Amino acid sequence: MDKIAVLIPCYNESKTVEKVVSDFRRVLPDATVYVYDNNSTDGTAELAAGAGAVVRHEYQQGKGNVMRRMFREIDAEAYILVDGDDTYPAEAAPEMVAAVTGRQADMVVGDRLSSTYYTQNKRPFHNFGNDLVRFCTNHLFGGKIKDIMTGYRAFSYQFVKTYPVLSRGFEIETEMTIHALQRNMQVENVVIDYRDRPEGSESKLNTYSDGFKVLGTIARLLKTYRP
């Protein structure tokens, strides 16, 4: 079992993956860094391996599918999940891990919305969507989660091994937040700085289609947990 596992799902992140891997290896020297490549065509996997990551593959497209394989295959005392786009600061990882190992948190949310997200993010409808999803999730499920859609979290072993990954795409962030709330797991928020993607790096999230899927996930889980 790893002491700390850093899990990085990637699809065509050749411009940033080397830096992300190197940054997390630097701030968490006791961690094993895993990059799960999701059919990249730009050399992401090779670059990640060259930077020192353990590279594995998921051939079913979609972030949820990648996370299902990650959570099934990797055993660790604490986990960091982070996107490979270099928008999240590795420097916050030790504090997030400490919340899991020291305070027994099951999920630690890297909260962008209380920091630099609204000034750094150049997609205004993403801002509105984040606010809407946060309001709906907290209001309907009784949470105090500051950032539902963040791609930066820490988890306990208990969370990872009891969470049934159902969603295939970007709805996964909302789904796992609701799972933690419904299971009365300990959730903490850690404020992090956020920076927009570097020039030439493109988001895989579609504001409208993925946004409707997220709202549909909230409705589906509300029906499941609160029939």
Where are these regions (language model features)?
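Conserved donor nucleotide-binding strand/loop of the catalytic core
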Residues: 32-34, 45-73
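Catalytic donor-sugar/metal-binding loop of nucleotide-sugar-dependent glycosyltransferases
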Residues: 143-144, 165-168, 177-195
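Acceptor/aglycone-binding surface of glycosyltransferases and processive sugar-polymer synthases
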Residues: 59-73, 90-170, 196-217
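Acidic helix N-cap motif at the loop->helix transition within catalytic regions
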Residues: 15-19, 41-51
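Short, well-formed alpha-helical segments that are part of the catalytic scaffolds
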Residues: 12-26
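Short beta-strand/loop segment that forms part of the nucleotide-sugar
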Residues: 7-8, 20-21, 30-39
